[in-house]
Swiss-Prot record:
Binding-site residues for heme b, renumbered to this chain: H266
Record carries keyword Plastid: no
Active-site residues, record numbering mapped to chain: H93 (proton acceptor)
Tryptophyl-tyrosyl-methioninium (Tyr-Met) (with W-92) crosslink residues: Y225-M251
GO molecular function: catalase activity; heme binding; metal ion binding
Family per similarity comment: Belongs to the peroxidase family. Peroxidase/catalase subfamily.
HAMAP family: Catal_peroxid
Reactions listed under catalytic activity: H2O2 + AH2 = A + 2 H2O; 2 H2O2 = O2 + 2 H2O
Gene: katG
Cofactor: heme b
Main location as per UniProt: cytoplasm
Main function: Bifunctional enzyme with both catalase and broad-spectrum peroxidase activity.
Protein name per UniProt: Catalase-peroxidase
Length: 730
């Protein structure tokens, strides 16, 4: 049924109609905490991807992928008879959504096949790339995930065109529903950017000074990176370089990596703009059911091959678009460039007074003059980019190596530690952006050691709440998106984490000094090479203190190692510092987000469910673990004991709450006596105001809720403490 005939925009079944978010758009939503559960996985809760992958014929898969590169299909023919450039773009656009500020995006979950990514304008026609892969995915089944296959295909594509690669690691399990946690922007129109610059700077139209809102890295809604025509479509290479630098830095790429990726990526393939985009139909998510997930139906001539429309630009960068070369940089500096229009009406650049020697993608008798994008010329017009580009031009081996390393980083930046990596092509060289942690090459502590260490820790004189606080501070840096942070490595003792305000540096220093002495004493008394890492000891100390506070056993799993300062990129790790952390009652609302929204966001990074979030906050409050030692949210007369008092007192109808300090904090007042009994934050009161969180809080606040709170808190605590111990699963 065509769009004009479709009456089902507001269906009266399957969840259609007006929703709560339509009535109350500012209401705190918990959807992001209910995603990617075992119930949503058709492979079942017992399926283990790492085990399935071990049975994969990896070399057979790579051979099939290499054969696919030149197996051009009539329904979507390959440019130049080779799909290499097409699949490089697919891999790039799958991984390239990663941003370092919040660790979200990237290719680690196979989200490229789900909305909105599968229908972004910048991903035009990549639905065909995924469809070309289906026979191979079908053949190998669940031994290879879509997430791994997308990126491995791009790697094989480069190899098949003579490019150097640095290696490849599999290990990305698929998810089975569209990601609902990532903030892609507030714009409501494709390719809009009014909100992301309005929220980031005073003058959103000044392309030379405006600031992109954090944590975004893309300059338009629906683009992976920058506008290839220039900022807002203005063909200004200098301003374009500014956008490029902002975007690539937020992807964790420095200037050299940025130049290598752009120059290397544009060595291959072409762009597509045979005619205006008015010839294109709906994107996959908006296409009719008979399209079977394919979108952008093209009414221009054949609608494929030489008539393809994607970006609207029509550029073939080199004379060897299916072979690695240095021609891209050679042409960039050899020619002067003049602004022209593509057949689709887009701004692009053509070499002045140059002969036509660039091959056509389909007609062997047709040649084109060299052409470039505004973003290409940015590498020549920006001084730093130009310097790097000229060095690569003069040193092709450096260029090839830099591209291989930057490409590897692009594909693996959100993979997490090497304990997650699978396959025979894992490079031996460790890179600083991997957040390396030494391998354990010594016996780890036994249960007897654990028991003895707990006794020594608890008698050390350090407040038990401070031990819990330190363990939480160490473990809760974990980000489920890019698998960074966590307790392994004990980076809480290193810059920059040791100096973060949220970690209360003076208190942290005292705790770490005491634990360091216990560590030294234990290690010096051992024979046979056994040692306890500070990373393990920090978590053990928290567990021991919690055990004392709860009166029940708390599990502990050893196996962490201590990273060095040299293994820690200070600038990169600075992205993990929280603006607000409701678990520790740190921070306050910003003009863009209330404190309770940031609490849920942090809970999502920790892969928590709504009940886990609720139990943890309520438990941490009565354990007296606020970052600054304040009584905010400590709704109990017996701080330091794990009880359900937080919920009992928050839900007490005899208490009324009055906002203070711009409604960031609230006084709990006895309705009869007007006595001020408590003070709480937005991160506290949300458990009584948000209906779904209140429902959970009522379970814990009931007369029979104390035992359940203790049980659930310890389970959630144990989960957080071990989030980055991926080896525990295997």
């Amino acid at each position: 049924m065509g769009d004009s005939k479709c009456p089902y925009r507001d269906a009266n079944v399957a969840g259609g109609g007006t929703h709560n978010k339509d009535w109350w758009p500012e209401t705190l939503k918990l959807d992001a905490l209910r995603q990617h559960t075992a119930e949503s996985n058709p492979l079942g809760k017992d399926f283990d991807y790492a085990s399935a992958f071990k049975t994969l014929d990896y070399e057979g898969l790579k051979k099939d992928l290499k054969d696919l590169m030149t197996d051009s299909q009539d329904w979507w023919p390959a440019d130049f008879g080779h799909y290499g450039g097409f699949f490089v773009r697919m891999a790039w656009h799958s991984a390239g959504t990663y941003r370092s500020i919040d660790g979200r995006g990237g290719g680690g979950q196979g989200q490229h096949r789900f909305a909105p990514l599968n229908s972004w304008p910048d991903n035009g026609n990549l639905d065909k790339a995924r469809r070309l892969l289906w026979p191979i995915k079908q053949k190998y089944g669940n031994k290879i995930s879509w997430a791994d296959l997308y990126l491995l295909t791009g790697n094989v594509a480069i190899e098949s065109m003579g490019g150097k690669t640095f290696g490849f690691a599999c290990g990305r399990p698929d998810t089975w529903e569209a990601d609902d946690a990532t903030f892609w922007g507030n714009e409501t129109k494709w390719l809009g950017n009014d909100a992301r610059y309005k929220n980031g700077s005073k003058d959103p139209k000044d392309i030379y000074t405006r600031q992109l809102e954090k944590p975004l890295s893309a300059v338009h809604m629906g683009l992976i990176y920058v506008n290839p025509e220039g900022p807002d479509g203005i063909p200004d290479p200098v301003a374009s370089a500014r956008d490029i630098r902002t975007t690539f830095r937020r992807m964790a790429m420095n200037d050299e990596e940025t130049v290598a990726l752009i120059a290397g990526g544009h060595t291959f393939g072409k762009t597509h703009g045979a005619a205006p985009a008015t010839h294109l139909g709906k994107e996959p998510e908006g296409a009719p059911i008979e399209a079977q997930g394919l979108g952008w139906a093209n009414s221009y001539r054949s609608g494929k091959g030489p008539d393809t429309i994607t970006s609207g630009l029509e550029v073939i960068w080199t004379k060897t678009p299916i072979n690695w070369s240095n021609h891209y940089l050679e042409y960039l500096f050899k020619y002067d460039w003049e602004l022209t229009k593509s057949p689709g009406g887009a701004n692009q650049w053509t070499a002045k007074n140059a002969e036509a020697f660039i091959p056509d993608a389909f007609d062997p008798n047709k040649k084109h003059p060299p052409r470039m994008l505004t973003t290409d010329l940015a590498l020549r017009h920006d001084k730093e980019y130009e310097k790097i580009s000229l060095r690569f031009l003069e040193n092709p081996d450096q260029f090839a190596d830099a591209f291989a390393r930057a490409w590897f980083k692009l594909l693996h930046r959100d993979m997490g530690p090497r304990s997650r990596w699978l396959g025979p092509e894992i490079p031996k060289e460790e890179l600083i952006w991997e957040d390396p942690i030494p391998e354990i090459d010594h016996p780890i502590i036994s249960q007897e050691d654990i028991n003895n260490l707990k006794k020594e820790i608890l008698s050390s004189g350090v407040g038990h709440n401070k031990l819990i606080q330190t363990a939480w501070a160490s473990a809760s840096t974990f980000r489920g998106g890019d698998k960074r942070g966590g307790a392994n490595g004990a980076r809480i003792r290193l810059a920059p984490q040791k100096d973060w305000k949220v970690n209360n540096p003076p208190q942290l220093t005292c705790v770490l000094e005491t634990l360091g002495k216990i560590q030294s004493s234990f290690n010096s008394s051992q024979t046979g090479g056994k040692i306890v890492s500070l990373a393990d000891l920090i978590i053990l100390a928290g567990c021991a203190a919690l055990e004392k506070a709860a009166g029940v056993p708390v599990p502990f799993s050893p196996g962490r190692a201590d990273a060095s300062q040299e293994q820690t990129d200070i600038k990169s790790f600075s992205n993990l510092e929280p603006v607000a952390d409701g678990f520790r009652n740190f921070g306050r609302s910003t003009p863009r987000a209330r404190a309770e929204h940031m609490l849920v966001d942090r809970a999502q990074l920790l892969t928590l469910t709504p009940p886990e979030l609720t139990a943890l906050v309520g438990g941490l409050r009565v354990l007296d673990t606020n970052f600054d030692g304040s009584s905010c949210g400590v709704f109990t007369k017996r701080p330091g004991q794990l009880t359900n008092d937080f919920f009992v007192n928050l839900l007490d109808p005899a208490i009324s709450w009055k906002g203070i300090d711009e409604d960031e904090f609230f006084e709990g007042i006895d309705r009869k006596t007007d006595e001020k009994k408590w003070i709480g934050s937005r991160a506290d009161l949300v458990f009584g105001s948000q209906a779904e969180l209140r429902a959970i809080a009522e379970v814990y606040g009931s007369a029979d809720g104390n035992e359940k709170l203790i049980k659930d808190f310890i389970a959630a605590w144990n989960k957080v403490m071990n989030l980055d111990l991926f080896n525990l699963a295997h």
